[in-house]
């Protein structure tokens, strides 16, 4: 309850600050506040809200708060219980960035189902906006496989989700949530040519990325050592030597 009061007070302050900053007479502007500047950007529609929530009741509460103060939530992240309010998310045009099959690591992350992504996606006759995400440095390198797992779970649950449709979960839907769908996220004339060419089915663990283009420029070529960026990221999770089991 105390947290709810704090959130509401922050938005009340932001509304007053925004009203003050809109005064034509700059002498009447309030003292500059960087935190309130950010909330003012949200109220003015200049900043997209990426809201971190696990539970359905928390997401519903944040939606009510956004309506009270007239701002838009673009996406909920982690959203383990998004399947419980999938229709509400679709009605409000809110995306949900979700893990394929990771949950149970803390109390608010207990109540998930493997078809979470598919249920959000298929809400309101398929108008939901689901995103398969990872905030893990290893998992992000296998995001196509994470999407494949979510697609398989959805189809096991009775949904008929094609590979082409599931590809949106890691392409156009994230671009939509980031506010850059007009620039990237799909292959269309006029958009940035951000493209990966695979050796086979992108959802197969046996497929490899053969070429990567970023804004139309070749950034990676599996057959050309000169176009293979060097990374200092070690694949896999390696414990420091002093922490390894002897």
Predicted feature locations:
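Conserved, well-ordered alpha-helix/loop/beta-strand core segments that scaffold catalytic motifs
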Residues: 56-61, 65-69, 74
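C-terminal cap of metal-dependent C-N hydrolases
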Residues: 188-233
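Hard-cation-handling environments
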Residues: 21, 31-38, 42-48, 54
